[in-house]
Amino acid sequence: MNTNEKIIEIFIINSLIKINKRYKELELSQNLFNQGIDSLDFFKLIFILEQKFKLKVNQKDYNKLNTLKKIKKYVLKKKI
């Protein structure tokens, strides 16, 4: 994992913890909604990522962004 990947991963995790402290035990590769994230918190995270990384997450992609790992890859791809 390169430095950018690690920075983005840490930012995503820390953002989720700020949204709700119960999210500090999430697994990177497991479905976020199966781990207890609700849709409101998911949209809060998307908003935070759009603001921080100056990107726009397409609504059609929401269903694909169901793990922390997929969100990280999406942000990396959009930033390039």
Task: Please report, for each region that a protein language model flagged, where it lies by residue.
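Phosphopantetheine carrier-protein modules
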Residues: 17-34, 54-60, 64
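DNA-binding alpha-helical recognition surfaces that contact promoter or target DNA
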Residues: 51, 73
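Thiotemplate assembly-line natural product biosynthesis machinery
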Residues: 1-24, 76-80
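Two-component histidine kinase catalytic core, primarily the HATPase_c
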Residues: 41
